[in-house]
Structures are given as structure tokens and as C-alpha cells.
């Protein structure tokens, strides 16, 4: 599966804001050292610990918003597992753009690479089983599009990007509506017909109710493995159409056991909420310094 970047028209707006947040009234240090577009040079990005690389196209775009002529050449493809010391990008252009954009570009790539790295660890645990890992809406405000892109790079599939993607009837919806049957009935009377309905369940009785009212996807939330196996058996016996999703307290230690219950999807926020940044750095090649245009 190829990870798909959000449209640049959307990302550019985000990148502009993040650059403005860092630059403020101007990069005092760099502007004092180098008048705009006066000195050119080269730099490289280096991996300081093993991990899966994600976010190089976004780093490229970040720098190009500061200098459209800057050259950012990835040395590895997105999703590659790199080792400490590998060079992952070669950059050439004006020093003012290189130095001013360095932190924002690196921050994004480090964050996304950390997510992709942990995602791959989860995916590898279930790679030989007929189940798909999916992410959740537990994302950092403002970073959802990129964090979900990173889970794709790591081998997962995106769940809902937002509330407008599909209907998911969760425990609080059920409580507010008075029950699963009541919630589904109200929803079917108002949603566009192409939208699927997913229902969160915690008991076998709730699974039966969701089946009776023709939910498209049934989530088994925080169930024990034994209860999950029973729920899967009930659903498979009564419908070959309904998809089954397991969720809740999924860890690297438990994900394979969850997958072996026979569910179609396993959703977890862990690759995003529990990942750490992958350590990357940029090093200027001091011997390549030259006046711009020379």
C-alpha cells in the first residue's frame, strides 16, 4: 500500500503557519550572518538511530516555501528502515533558507518517522494474518493529516479522518440515544445512504442488537480474548457482510492474540500516542560555502 500525502493546497497552509510560528519577526541569527540569498551551500540529513523514515516530501516542501530554488534530494524512499549514520537527504541552496527552515522541517520528519517506526512494529506482528491495522482520531490537533500519513508509511490503514467520514456509534452516543437500536434507527433516517454505520459494543447482547439492526461494522471494544472469540463466532454465523473491528488496550504484546480471534481490523492509537520522535539531524558542509549564483 502506497502512503498518500494530503493535497499540497491543504499542507501549504499548515506549513506556512508552522514556519511563521518559528520565524516570528525574523530569524535574528541567520539574517545577521547572511543577507538574504547571499551565500549558498549544501547540507545532509543523517539518521541518529534506527527507524522508519517518513516525511521527506514534507521537509522538501517546507524548505521550498522559503526558497523555491532549493534542492532537497531524498537518498532513501519513504518507509525505508534506516540504520544509525545513514544519510537520508542531500540539500543545496541558500544558507538563509537552509538554516531558517531546519527546525520545522526536522521536527515534522522526526515526529512522522517516530510514528512510522512504531506502526511498522505493530504491523510486523500480524503481517502473516488476514487482518488490517487501522489508526484512530486520537491525533495531535493540527497534525492529524500528517500523523495519519505516517501510519500509512508504517503499513497501517487510516480509519476515519474526521467525523464526516463515516458514522461510528460509540458508548456515549448509545447512552445519549437510549440504546443501540434507538441510535441506529435515528441515524438511518438522516444520513446519506453511502455512509457506513459502525457500532461499538462491549457485550454479546450488544453484538446481537447491532447485528439485528444491520450495522455494517461491529467494534468489539475492550473485550477479553475469550469474549472476542465468542463475538466473532456469533457475527460470522449470522452475517458474511458485517466487518469486525477490535479495539481497546492493544499493545505490541497483545496484538497478535487479538488478530488470531478472527477480526478483520484492529484499531489502536498507540503508534501515534505512544511513539517517540526518531532522532535526525542536519549537518552543513562547511567546505561548500560560496556566494549565491557563483
Kindly label every feature range from the protein language model.
Residues 245-247, 282:
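Short glycine/threonine-rich catalytic loop with a Thr-x-Gly-x-Asp
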Residues 237-243, 285-290:
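Short acidic, glycine/proline-enriched helix-loop-strand junctions
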Residues 222, 248, 270:
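Short secondary-structure boundary segments
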Residues 252:
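Cys/His-rich Zn2+-binding cysteine-cluster or related metal-binding knuckle/ribbon modules and their
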Residues 270-294:
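Short, charged, intrinsically disordered terminal tails
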Residues 1-9, 287-294:
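Short, low-complexity, intrinsically disordered N-terminal peptides in bacterial proteins
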Residues 2-213, 217, 226-234, 243-245, ...:
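Acidic/glycine-rich phosphate/pyrophosphate-binding loops and surrounding catalytic core
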Amino acid at each position: 500500500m502506497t502512503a498518500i500525502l494530503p493535497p499540497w493546497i491543504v499542507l501549504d497552509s499548515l506549513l506556512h503557519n508552522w514556519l511563521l510560528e518559528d520565524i516570528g519577526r525574523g530569524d535574528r541569527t541567520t539574517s545577521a550572518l547572511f543577507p538574504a540569498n547571499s551565500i549558498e551551500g549544501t547540507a545532509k540529513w543523517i539518521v541518529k538511530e534506527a527507524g522508519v523514515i517518513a516525511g521527506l516530501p514534507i521537509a522538501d516542501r517546507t524548505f521550498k516555501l522559503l526558497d523555491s530554488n532549493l534542492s532537497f534530494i531524498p537518498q532513501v524512499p519513504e518507509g525505508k528502515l534506516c540504520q544509525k549514520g545513514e544519510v537520508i537527504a542531500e540539500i543545496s541552496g541558500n544558507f538563509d533558507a537552509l538554516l531558517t527552515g531546519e527546525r520545522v522541517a526536522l521536527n515534522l520528519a522526526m515526529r512522522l518517522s517516530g510514528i512510522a517506526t512504531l506502526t511498522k512494529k505493530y504491523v510486523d506482528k500480524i503481517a502473516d494474518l488476514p487482518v488490517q491495522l487501522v489508526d484512530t482520531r486520537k491525533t495531535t490537533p493540527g497534525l492529524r493529516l500528517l500523523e495519519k500519513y505516517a501510519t500509512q508509511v508504517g503499513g497501517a490503514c487510516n480509519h476515519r479522518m474526521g467525523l464526516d467520514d463515516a458514522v461510528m456509534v460509540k458508548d456515549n452516543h448509545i447512552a445519549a440515544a437510549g440504546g443501540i437500536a434507538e441510535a441506529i434507527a435515528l441515524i438511518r433516517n438522516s444520513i446519506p445512504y453511502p455512509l457506513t454505520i459502525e457500532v461499538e459494543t462491549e457485550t454479546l447482547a450488544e453484538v446481537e442488537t447491532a447485528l439485528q439492526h444491520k450495522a455494517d461494522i461491529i467494534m468489539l471494544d475492550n473485550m477479553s480474548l475469550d469474549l472476542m472469540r465468542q463475538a466473532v463466532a456469533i457475527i460470522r454465523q449470522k452475517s458474511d457482510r458485517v466487518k469486525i473491528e477490535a479495539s481497546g488496550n492493544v499493545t505490541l504484546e497483545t496484538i497478535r492474540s487479538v488478530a488470531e480471534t478472527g477480526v478483520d481490523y484492529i484499531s489502536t492509537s498507540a503508534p501515534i500516542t505512544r511513539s517517540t520522535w526518531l532522532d535526525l539531524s542536519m549537518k552543513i558542509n562547511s567546505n561548500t560555502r560560496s556566494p549565491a549564483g557563483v
